[in-house]
Regions:
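Substrate-binding and catalytic surfaces of secreted/luminal carbohydrate-active proteins
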Residues: 1-205
Length: 205
C-alpha cells in the first residue's frame, strides 16, 4: 500500500481510507501510514476465527488485536463470517473458517467464538469515542536489569464515550497473573488480571 501512495500521489485524495486484511504482518507495521497520511482512515477487515484453532477460547488473541488496532489509530475492526455451521460451511474458500457464531446444522444450538466474546468488550465504542493507549506502572520492570524475552504483559486502551463514561479495556494474554496500577481521576487503581483474561472496567460519570 505504501508504494501505491508514493507512486500515485493523487491517490490520497481519491480515497478516504485503507483496509487491511488478516493474512500476514502485524497491525504495528501499518502505523507509519497513519503517521504519514493522517487524513486517511485505517480499517481492519476480513478477520475471523478458524474452527480448528482454539475457536471458542481465543478471546485474548482477538481482544489484543482490537486493542492494538484502536491504539494505532484504526477507525474500524470488521470480522468475517457472521454465522457458519459446525463444519465451517457453507465454505466457498480454501480456509476452514469459523463463524462469529456457530449454529449446529442438526440441533440448531448456538455456540460462540472467542472473537464474539472479545467484541463484547468494545460494544460501547462509537465513531465519536476518543481512544487513548494505556501505560501501566510495573514494579517488576524496575527491579530487573533486563526484560525477560518473550514475556507477555497486560495491554489495554482507554475509551472516552460521549455518554460521559470512561472505560478501560484490558487483556492479559500471559499464562501468569499480573498485578498492575493505573492512575485515573487523582487516584491510583489496583487491577489484578488473571491469566488468559480480558476485562472491561467502567468509570461512570
Amino acid at each position: 500500500m505504501a508504494w501505491c501512495l508514493k507512486e500515485y500521489p493523487s491517490l490520497k485524495f481519491d480515497c478516504d481510507g485503507i483496509a487491511f486484511h488478516y493474512y500476514g504482518g502485524t497491525i504495528e507495521q501499518t502505523t507509519f501510514i497513519k503517521n504519514e497520511y493522517p487524513n486517511l482512515q485505517l480499517h481492519f477487515t476480513e478477520g475471523g476465527p478458524r474452527r480448528y484453532d482454539n475457536y471458542d477460547t481465543d478471546w485474548c488473541k482477538w481482544t489484543l488485536m482490537m486493542i492494538k488496532a484502536l491504539n494505532n489509530g484504526y477507525s474500524s475492526f470488521t470480522g468475517w463470517n457472521l454465522m457458519l455451521d459446525e463444519a465451517g460451511g457453507p465454505n466457498v474458500g480454501p480456509f476452514f473458517c469459523g463463524g462469529l457464531v456457530t449454529r449446529n446444522y442438526h440441533s440448531g444450538e448456538l455456540s460462540y467464538s472467542g472473537q464474539y466474546k472479545a467484541f463484547k468488550h468494545f460494544k460501547g465504542i462509537t465513531s465519536s469515542s476518543q481512544i487513548h493507549p494505556l501505560h501501566f506502572m510495573r514494579g517488576e520492570l524496575k527491579m530487573h536489569a533486563f526484560d525477560r524475552k518473550g514475556k507477555l504483559y497486560t495491554e489495554g486502551c482507554l475509551v472516552e464515550n460521549t455518554s460521559g463514561n470512561t472505560e478501560i479495556v484490558l487483556v492479559n494474554p500471559s499464562t501468569e497473573k499480573e498485578q498492575i496500577q493505573y492512575y485515573y481521576c487523582d487516584k491510583w487503581w489496583y487491577i489484578e488480571m488473571l491469566p488468559n483474561t480480558a476485562a472491561t472496567i467502567v468509570f461512570e460519570s
